């Protein structure tokens, strides 16, 4: 937590002022009147004169926390503004930001694309997001497990298996009527060439589902596709600790026993199906758990999976889904509330919007079934992984990502990832000739008074608080925003101030100390984002 927040909470307690501890008390602001840390805390206090109370708080902080602040003052709008003392800035310059290990066990499940083809551009945003979230959680000290949920039981897996079955016929020049939602492409054909021992009887889809070879064929198809998916993920430096199979979870789930965990009025039978009365917990309608054919619904398998997650002793569960699953979020929270799991195991679900690729000023339509997709390998031929990561992580979760390849491939300051990497390379260039022993002896930063230096110091102060905020909000674009804003400040400072000035030794050493701290923070963030941190450019 930002030390100013801690100081404010102590102050409010001392002044007997009631406040909501969950409110964000302090923000880093940048406007024409003031740039730095400011608080609107008095706006959240009931029954007080805002101006007088703000002045009381400022006076208390200057008296009891004098070492932390050069100045605390109340603006005309009753914001409390903070100017941090050189002594406190020095603490941040001399201490590398780290986090102690936490006992919290976290399961992060992401990507989880159906095993029906290669991963494509539509999956990459999810892949990068989950990867960076995991990196962040590890950096913050959490114990994480990375999991991929293999949807090998549902209708899509069956249709894919049927498509492979039909490809077997086509390879023998036997005409068949394709499934209306069937899959095509090189992967389907290549898998079909590995399948042997299956009679070619031109079965309908319904007949296909009754065959004794069905389970083995679907398992073989899933295994082949997962080999490709794992290779795709390794190409973009993503690996998982656990691969959880839907078919296995369904096999191990006793749905009658599962129902006993809900109160009696929370489930019922209707039209031969078993329903969960999720409306009891705020859902807009009840949901089918087990269908008339005794197969669990998509919702039913997800319920079983999430109960399995909770049973494994995790304290915090993260689900990273696509926007097409957004309507599913509410009902999963309803299940956790109905079983009171949320009291011991917190569930957080993030739904990410689509990715759109522009080529020749037209949107490229993606369709895995038609075999006409932009695969990960093809994407990496069109833009670098660094650029792909940046552009897919730099917008809010509910924003549709629109990538213009010309912009993403620019090698100048118009390309934000290039701009940030160039800042890091500049820092490396300066630091490689610095006397580290002399720099370690610097115990003052009072000469850092340029407005750009104060702004950069504030960015350093804010860094740990930012990471904690992102861990709670899942808004990973705040990380790229921070890097870009700090890079902009750095480049302007580099241009405005002579960092290495032999005529001003003490000022030079203090500026080098600032630069070294920036270099460390940039390195940590680029590592979390898994974006290359170049030593030179």
Swiss-Prot record:
Cite the GO molecular-function annotations of the record.
Answer: arginine-tRNA ligase activity; ATP binding
Record SMART domains: DALR_1
Under which main EC class is this enzyme filed?
ligase
Question: Which compartments does it reside in?
Answer: Cytoplasm
Q: Which reaction does it catalyse?
A: tRNA(Arg) + L-arginine + ATP = L-arginyl-tRNA(Arg) + AMP + diphosphate
**Keywords, A to Z?**
Aminoacyl-tRNA synthetase, ATP-binding, Cytoplasm, Ligase, Nucleotide-binding, Protein biosynthesis
Q: InterPro entries from the entry?
A: aa-tRNA-synth_I_CS, Arg-tRNA-ligase, ArgRS_core, DALR_anticod-bd, Rossmann-like_a/b/a_fold, tRNAsynth_Ia_anticodon-bd
Identify the EC number(s): 6.1.1.19
CDD domains in UniProt: ArgRS_core
| Annotated motif 'HIGH' region, positions | 113-123
**GO BP of this protein:** arginyl-tRNA aminoacylation
Q: Which domain of life is it from?
A: Bacteria
One GO CC term of this entry?
cytoplasm
Q: Pfam families attached here?
A: DALR_1 (PF05746), tRNA-synt_1d (PF00750)
For the keyword Ribosomal protein, the answer is no
What does the sequence similarity comment in the record state about its family? Answer: Belongs to the class-I aminoacyl-tRNA synthetase family.
PANTHER family annotated for this entry? Answer: ARGININE--TRNA LIGASE, CYTOPLASMIC, ARGINYL-TRNA SYNTHETASE
Quaternary structure (record): Monomer.
Question: What is the name attached to this protein's record?
Answer: Arginine--tRNA ligase
Recorded source organism is Mycoplasma pneumoniae (strain ATCC 29342 / M129 / Subtype 1) (Mycoplasmoides pneumoniae)
